[in-house]
């Protein structure tokens, strides 16, 4: 069985991922920068579908209009030559010192600049064919509880997103926004730290249909949460507009590991995306190990795609993967589909004596989760996929 990725698999990478130079708070870069054109070419050779970018990844901050046009022209030529796509773009509103905050800054001029910088890159994203625009609020928050009124900050954030939604609508762009939640870093207390926070915020916007979420594996795990549950809720809400795949080793700083971390959880993530019919790109937001040279960078990118394809297979190809799938399963749960409704409305429920008066509490308490034969009506809807897991062996 081949695990060679093809564009049909829709694997994408950010310029900032394979282009990460290995710089961290305690050490300088271990690799030189990567030319975006080379990135496009190498990822295409590996079988990727597309590439994503922050504005400053493609056009260094402060570039003149002439320099910007030159960078874009070279990038577009590389896309045309390789057939690579740009499904998503985003804005760097966190690196330059002006962005101590951004959409929620106490300084009105900083807020206005952040929105205008975003609008400029939205134009480029739409020009390159992007369908999703990700917004990560890494600088939205505080280290001191008295530094900012959170209610005012949320009002400011709402104003910014409403303006962006108005702009996209006025321009007629076929573009939706995906808010990327993250806790703990770089601000001590970040606004919209989890999928749930983002979903609640979206409902207060003027055009909620334009906004969804871009959950990242490591970000939910940084908060000690269950990532498959988070993306399941996003799918349930119809708001999974994009997804960032990577690995994380527990509650700590944002590691952005490749898929080598937590393969058991990866099984559930991949199965959920595939069984739910998610049609968006499978985007890897990871950092190649700081210890690697460029050969290791491309090997790690290739490994991300290969591991996804391995986990996607209904029957694992190797004993280690089988063990991972068994450990990831909940052996006593035999179904992943919803059961039949409680009743045909409230009146029918109140009239149903088996729901309360005649309900055998002790018998139900003694019943295990695995039931044979299956209760009448508790079957999968037509065409609904289910998780198939090998039985546990001791």
Swiss-Prot record:
Query: So where's the catalytic machinery, residue-wise?
Result: 54, 57
Which residue ranges does the record annotate as region Disordered? Answer: 370-394
Annotated residues for binding of Mg(2+) 2: 216, 219, 254, 256
**Cofactor(s) needed:** Mg(2+)
| GO biological process terms on file | D-xylose metabolic process
Where in or outside the cell it occurs: the entry states:
Cytoplasm
Annotated GO molecular function terms are: magnesium ion binding; xylose isomerase activity
- The UniProt entry's coiled-coil ranges are none
Q: Which residues bind Mg(2+) 1?
A: 180, 216, 244, 285
Family, according to the entry, reads as follows: Belongs to the xylose isomerase family.
Q: Which HAMAP family does this UniProt record tie to the protein?
A: Xylose_isom_A
- Its protein name is Xylose isomerase
Gene encoding it? Answer: xylA
């Amino acid at each position: 069985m081949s695990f060679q990725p093809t564009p049909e698999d829709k694997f994408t990478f950010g310029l900032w991922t394979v282009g990460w130079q290995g710089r961290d708070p305690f050490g300088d870069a271990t690799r030189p920068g990567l030319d975006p054109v080379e990135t496009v070419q190498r990822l295409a050779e590996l079988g990727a579908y597309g590439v994503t970018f922050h504005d400053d990844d493609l056009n260094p901050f402060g570039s003149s209009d002439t320099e910007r046009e030159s960078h874009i022209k070279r990038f577009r030529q590389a896309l045309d030559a390789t057939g690579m796509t740009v499904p998503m773009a985003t804005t760097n509103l966190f690196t330059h010192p002006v962005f101590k905050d951004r959409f929620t800054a106490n300084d009105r001029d900083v807020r206005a600049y952040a929105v205008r910088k975003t609008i400029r890159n939205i134009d480029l994203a739409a020009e390159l064919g992007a369908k999703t625009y990700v917004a990560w609020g890494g600088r939205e928050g505080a280290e001191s509880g008295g530094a900012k009124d959170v209610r005012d900050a949320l009002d400011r954030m709402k104003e910014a997103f409403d303006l962006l939604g108005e702009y996209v609508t006025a321009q007629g762009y076929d573009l939706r926004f995906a808010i990327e939640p993250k806790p703990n870093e770089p601000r001590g207390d970040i606004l919209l730290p989890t999928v749930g926070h983002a979903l609640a915020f979206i409902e207060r916007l003027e055009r909620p249909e334009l906004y969804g979420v871009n959950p990242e594996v490591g970000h939910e795990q940084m908060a000690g949460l269950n990532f498959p549950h988070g993306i399941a809720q996003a799918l349930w809400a119809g708001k999974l507009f994009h997804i960032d795949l990577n690995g994380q080793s527990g509650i700590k700083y944002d590691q952005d590991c490749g898929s080598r971390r937590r393969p058991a959880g990866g099984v559930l993530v991949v199965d959920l995306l595939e069984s739910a019919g998610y049609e968006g790109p499978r985007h890897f937001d990871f950092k190649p190990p700081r210890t690697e040279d460029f050969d290791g960078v491309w090997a790690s990118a290739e490994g991300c795609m290969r591991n996804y394809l391995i986990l996607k297979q209904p029957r694992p190809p190797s004993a280690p993967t089988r063990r991972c799938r068994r450990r990831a399963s909940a052996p006593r749960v035999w179904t992943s589909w919803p059961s039949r409704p409680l009743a045909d409305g409230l009146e029918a429920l109140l009239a149903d004596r088996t729901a309360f008066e005649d309900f055998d509490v002790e018998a139900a308490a003694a019943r295990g989760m695995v039931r044979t034969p299956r209760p009448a009506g508790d079957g999968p809807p037509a065409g609904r996929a289910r998780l198939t897991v090998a039985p546990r062996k001791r």
